[in-house]
Amino acid sequence: IITSAVVLLMLLTSSVKVSAQTHKPDDILGTWLNQEATGKVQIYKEGDKYFGKLVWLRTPLDSITGLPRTDKENPDVKLKSSPLIGLVNLKNFTFDGKDQWSSGTIYDPKNGKTYKCYIEFESANKLKIRGYVGISLIGRNTFWTRSIN
């Protein structure tokens, strides 16, 4: 019985994610490729807050106009003509002191909506981005991979 308990304890502790490791606040900085490989976001720091902006799109030009793609789904009419490249879509994240960047928002230019969000490492070069409405149980995850260029 003791052997079974020891084996179970070893299995449980060995399956802890990389995110259980303590990260430094600036570990998140850099350029990240989104899950669909259609865009890259550069995460940067201003003061003690973290932000992200679109720096690359697989399809940077509008298929109809041939001009740079714009934020056409934005609910603010004044922003619909803003270019997607350079758009700040991650705002006001703070590091919790251990493993999570939280209290921020993520803007989805595909639907023009902004969601509460937190970010944590899934593995050394992979972020888990959790966007949600209200409470984090009602939301979805997406995973971004660190980009080397």
Model-inferred region functions:
Residues 37-108, 114-116:
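Central antiparallel beta-sheet cores of small beta-barrel/beta-sandwich binding domains
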Residues 117-127:
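Short, compact, well-ordered microdomains
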Residues 124-126, 133-149:
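Edge beta-strand at a domain terminus
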